[in-house]
């Protein structure tokens, strides 16, 4: 097995395969033990690799992760960006090659400054802290791409009960720590004092997760609300066609009116009204006149234009409330290339993918109030926003109910929409709140405070999902403290590992010289 730890392509290929295993641990495959195996193989491959070899090994892991887990990017570029097959393939490959470097630098840092092969327990703790820091960096750098976090694999796994304590971050930390400890067990067997501590650290997260899986951190704040979530299933290539506008507006109106039984909340998906709000005022006023006497609130996605202090127009991806409710929400976390184009002065006009409809949105302000419907506070997330754990927690902590609307037609029949759904489920579990998820073509679903889907519609079907959700009160530990305790722990562990490694390098002796 020395070929795994030595520099060279055999170990790099194994790292590539290890990265490819991580998406298989998540939706729609949900083979959660593969997440543990993936991280164990990565740690084993980095345990003795010199810095340069570790850098390439980390890059191979990242490429395997994204090549399998984000293959749906090709569909967005080819099918809806009007790029030719070779160009779409080239752009997708280039993006994956670039994203893989997220893992290259941490692997180099690990080998160069943090690793201590003579202290397997401390080494495992430092590896878990570095993994946590890496996931945080991936969700922040250049607005972030917080996809495929290891912790999502545990939504149906034994560690799920930890999510209300520390969010998906705590699950990822526990997985990385467990993987490293399992790899180091043979070495720990020769160190009885360290072995005892390692066994406690190995078993405690899994036992705690199982024990807390059904614990209710929040409580109902009122009676259940009847919900109608409308899935219009409008084809993406027709959505922004002006000739299809009237048909789409009639479609959502008719789907809403088709059932005589009263409901409390009606939710339409992202940009269900595919024209600027100012041009849809009469239509929205008609919805308001219908909903208000029936004590119904209707929430829909719609593009919104506002002017800044200089009088310049700014366009936003928004949600408005009609009927018995109030509020307007402007999306804050924008999708690169889908809602704004980085370096647009250079990229605009090169290919159709850089000129998609509604790809010039502005970012909404950070201090927006929540939406209000039937007297309840609703935390809104438009599409991509629900994948940001800290951002979502900030809104959820002020809310009684969670709402996410999306248009996942960009991803076709790939695994992307199912990954997106899984992340929404994790947000509900972290917050201990019900979530309404309404999409254009699926998956439209109702999610309970334990992250379980109670009702759902099939993808690519025009239908209305009827069900009930309950407003909740109280804060989970994660909503109260967010990721700050874990971030502090990671800083302490990484600082300790760095200081120990520097002291080790500074100390004279043949063992130190050999490690150099």
From Swiss-Prot:
Main location as per UniProt: membrane
Membrane topology type: Multi-pass membrane protein
Domain of life: Bacteria
GO cellular component, one term: plasma membrane
Record CDD domains: ALP_N-acyl_transferase (cd07571)
InterPro entries in UniProt: Apolipo_AcylTrfase, C-N_Hydrolase, C-N_Hydrolase_sf, LNT_N
Entry's EC annotation: 2.3.1.269
Pfam families, A to Z: CN_hydrolase, LNT_N
Keyword Transmembrane: yes
Keywords: Acyltransferase, Cell inner membrane, Cell membrane, Membrane, Transferase, Transmembrane, Transmembrane helix
Domain named CN hydrolase: residues: 230-471
Transmembrane parts of this sequence: 24-44, 58-78, 90-110, 125-145, 163-183, 192-212, 479-499
Subcellular locations according to the entry: Cell inner membrane
GO molecular function: N-acyltransferase activity
Active-site residues annotated for this sequence: 270 (proton acceptor), 331, 383 (nucleophile)
Similarity annotation: Belongs to the CN hydrolase family. Apolipoprotein N-acyltransferase subfamily.
PANTHER family per record: APOLIPOPROTEIN N-ACYLTRANSFERASE
Function summary: Catalyzes the phospholipid dependent N-acylation of the N-terminal cysteine of apolipoprotein, the last step in lipoprotein maturation.
Stated name of the protein: Apolipoprotein N-acyltransferase
Organism: Azotobacter vinelandii (strain DJ / ATCC BAA-1303)
Lineage: Bacteria, Pseudomonadati, Pseudomonadota, Gammaproteobacteria, Pseudomonadales
